């Protein structure tokens, strides 16, 4: 079946069939505009591409503050200065496989904290990393066994966290949150999880900023 990766593959095939040129492994360093029209993209290796229209499928604040040259006023909300703009939550993503199968775990599982309003307040307003959390657990092998070797499972966990306007040290808290999530999943719905885990990794809001150019 393939999931999102298969969707990207088929979209690529479609673009190729209709004659769209796809350039990979080239990071856009800047986009230049003239008379309020963006017309040129410059890559990190100095290549220049000229266009009639440019569509940026990323975080708009990053585009206007870091990529568009010369810099213009805040085009997202011209009235508010950047310092007064509000941003959504950050995200912690935990990826892991297991050398067994948890057949009672569905393809999609929502794992909720006992708190609701207080948890959201900590994340969005106070920008504190709470001791508790709510999770989305994804098990694609529930419907597509090709996502893992025979007899194994593949997972990722999404955990809402404060964005980078917080003072959280993710070099420390990343491992702490990873361990807390695993402990809670093992305690509640995935017995003996720690002894079954293989190929564990995670992403913090810093990774989303560095790898995907999110603003916060």
Describe each model-derived feature in a short phrase.
Residues 35-37, 69, 168-171, 203-216:
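Short glycine/threonine-rich loop-to-helix capping motif typified by GTGT followed
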Residues 1-39:
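Helical element adjacent to the flavin cofactor pocket in flavoenzyme catalytic cores
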Residues 130-136, 191-216:
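A glycine-rich dinucleotide-binding beta-alpha-beta segment and adjacent secondary-structure elements
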Residues 61-66, 149-180:
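Conserved FAD/dinucleotide-binding core of flavoprotein oxidoreductases
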Residues 27-149:
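Mid-domain catalytic core of redox enzymes
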């Amino acid at each position: 079946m393939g999931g999102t990766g298969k969707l990207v593959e088929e979209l690529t095939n479609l673009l190729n069939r209709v004659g769209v040129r796809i350039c990979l492994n080239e990071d856009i360093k800047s986009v230049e505009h003239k008379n309020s029209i963006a017309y040129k993209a410059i890559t990190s290796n100095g290549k220049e591409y000229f266009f009639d229209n440019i569509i940026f499928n990323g975080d708009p604040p990053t585009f206007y503050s870091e990529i568009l040259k010369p810099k213009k006023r805040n085009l997202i909300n011209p009235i508010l200065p950047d310092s007064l703009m509000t941003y959504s939550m950050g995200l912690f993503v935990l990826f892991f496989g297991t050398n067994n199968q948890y057949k009672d775990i569905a393809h999609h599982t929502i794992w909720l904290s006992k708190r609701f309003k207080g948890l959201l307040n900590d994340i969005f307003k106070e920008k504190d990393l709470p001791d508790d959390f709510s999770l989305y657990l994804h098990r694609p092998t529930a419907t597509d066994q090709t996502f893992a070797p025979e007899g194994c499972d593949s997972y990722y966990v999404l955990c809402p966290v404060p964005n980078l306007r917080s003072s959280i040290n993710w070099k420390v808290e990343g491992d702490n949150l990873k361990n807390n999530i695993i402990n809670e999943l093992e305690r509640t719905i995935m017995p003996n999880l720690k002894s079954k885990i293989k190929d564990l990794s995670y992403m913090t809001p810093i990774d989303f900023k560095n790898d995907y150019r999110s603003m916060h």
